[in-house]
Amino acid sequence: MQTSPLLTQLMEALRCLSGVGPKSAQRMAFTLLQRDRSGGMRLAQALTRAMSEIGHCADCRTFTEQEVCNICSNPRRQENGQICVVESPADIYAIEQTGQFSGRYFVLMGHLSPLDGIGPDDIGLDRLEQRLAEEKITEVILATNPTVEGEATANYIAELCAQYDVEASRIAHGVPVGGELEMVDGTTLSHSLAGRHKIRF
């Protein structure tokens, strides 16, 4: 179909986003051009700056435009002694929204996957081991995803922590709040039963 080359280029560029297919990209492109050109310009400027200026924190490896992110440079967080290990920067945002954690993080940017050739050094475990050896860390909270690879990664890190006499704990997995028991898969239910706790009055 004969159309604007720039419009086609815009649609193809939008398809790099996760979950955006041809139809969604077309709809987004037309919306920006028809209704919100100023918003499109802001988006372009923000993307350009983010792509060129955002790197990784030297301590935890999350995304930041500084050498060390705001969380890692916070004195109160440093005094906490806890490090929460997650697979991606998005996991930090999810945990921070709960308001239940006041320590620092370490981002793996993935998980161990020998079949894909992803080993310990590929996910920064050499850097994590260095922190275990040099910093006063009292507990490592393993918040990797509840997948086979996530569990294997958590177990590997737990063994690493044991070598440095640092306590390692795993976040609980179980039945979601508001969910119905009959709809929960067997693996999740098994984790729930294994991780049960006493009710205290």
UniProtKB/Swiss-Prot annotation:
Organism, as annotated: Shigella dysenteriae serotype 1 (strain Sd197)
Homology family: Belongs to the RecR family.
Role played: May play a role in DNA repair. It seems to be involved in an RecBC-independent recombinational process of DNA repair. It may act with RecF and RecO.
Keyword check for Protein biosynthesis: no
Protein name per Swiss-Prot or TrEMBL: Recombination protein RecR
Domain Toprim: 81-176
GO biological process: DNA recombination; DNA repair
InterPro entries assigned to the protein according to its UniProt record, in alphabetical order: DNA_Rcmb_RecR, Rcmb_RecR, Rcmb_RecR_Znf, TOPRIM_dom, TOPRIM_RecR
